[in-house]
């Protein structure tokens, strides 16, 4: 049985001191959570140093929001895998729609980042995929999402796939207050799992974690997580306050 992976993505919020404070509340709040739920928080790069002091030795995994596919060199403003590992980073989010939109990350670049990350001892790499509103309205959702998966996972072996988490985030639902219905989300998640079966194997498809992201909150998370092919959530705004994030965690962990 697959575990539930609940990841908070704090985006460009909080100073390092503020982030450490929220992290401490979350760490304290999930000490007795059952083993079937994995808790993850993803602060800004500038907060990793202080937050890692809070998460170290706890049952909360620490993540980064992006990284370079190069390990060093003339890459002004970028962060390398080795730099992230120095701060105890357990996982990295790659291919988030905001990075695709504002930073110009293409499927090819994201694939390079995935392959680079697999050469380092991260526990997980989260590959984000999702369609825009116009793509959904033109019935291109599955074409877009499955192509992003094929390109993002190019040259990834089945053994390495065990360290990959997929996160379906419809772009039109991120930060808008809109969310896919549980039926809409399940339809896409099922198609993703079948695509993994086609690319790899039935066992790989059965094992891979597929999160949902897009205005997840305490009111809709129960229905979403009740679907067969949804294995957790990548949570934005509702993860910024410890209380709201812990409410989601506790609802899923029941």
Curated annotation (Swiss-Prot):
Q: What is its EC number?
A: 5.3.1.1
Give a Gene Ontology cellular component term annotated to this protein: cytosol
Q: Name one GO molecular function term.
A: triose-phosphate isomerase activity
Catalytic residues?
A: 96 (electrophile), 169 (proton acceptor)
Highest taxon of the source? Bacteria
Q: Does the keyword Acetylation apply?
A: no
Query: Which reactions does this protein catalyse?
Result: D-glyceraldehyde 3-phosphate = dihydroxyacetone phosphate
Record's signal peptide: none
Pathway per its UniProt entry is: Carbohydrate biosynthesis; gluconeogenesis; Carbohydrate degradation; glycolysis; D-glyceraldehyde 3-phosphate from glycerone phosphate: step 1/1
Q: State what this protein does.
A: Involved in the gluconeogenesis. Catalyzes stereospecifically the conversion of dihydroxyacetone phosphate (DHAP) to D-glyceraldehyde-3-phosphate (G3P).
Stated family: Belongs to the triosephosphate isomerase family.
Task: List the HAMAP family.
Answer: TIM_B
| The protein's name in its UniProt record | Triosephosphate isomerase
Q: Which organism is it from?
A: Borrelia hermsii (strain HS1 / DAH)
Q: Gene encoding it?
A: tpiA
């Amino acid at each position: 049985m697959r575990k539930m992976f609940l990841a908070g993505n704090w985006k460009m919020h909080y100073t390092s001191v503020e982030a450490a404070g929220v992290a401490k509340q979350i760490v304290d709040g999930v000490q007795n959570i059952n083993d079937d739920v994995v808790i993850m928080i993803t602060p800004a790069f500038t907060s990793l140093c202080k937050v890692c002091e809070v998460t170290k030795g706890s049952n909360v995994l620490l993540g980064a929001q992006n990284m370079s596919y190069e390990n060093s060199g003339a890459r002004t403003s970028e962060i390398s895998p080795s730099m992230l590992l120095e701060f105890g980073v357990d996982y990295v989010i790659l291919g988030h729609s905001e990075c695709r939109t504002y930073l110009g990350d293409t499927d090819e670049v994201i694939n390079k980042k995935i392959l680079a990350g697999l050469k380092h001892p991260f526990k997980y790499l989260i590959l984000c995929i999702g369609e825009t509103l116009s793509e959904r309205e033109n019935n291109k959702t599955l074409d877009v999402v499955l192509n992003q998966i094929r390109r993002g996972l190019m040259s990834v072996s089945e053994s390495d796939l065990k360290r990959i988490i997929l996160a379906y985030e419809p772009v039109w639902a991120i930060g808008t207050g809109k969310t896919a219905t549980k039926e809409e989300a399940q339809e896409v998640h099922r198609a993703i799992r079948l695509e993994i079966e086609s690319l790899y194997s039935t066992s790989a498809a059965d094992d891979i974690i597929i999160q949902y992201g897009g205005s997840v909150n305490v009111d809709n998370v129960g229905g979403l997580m009740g679907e067969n092919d949804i294995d957790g959530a990548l949570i934005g705004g509702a993860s910024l306050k410890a209380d709201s994030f812990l409410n989601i965690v506790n609802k899923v962990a029941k």
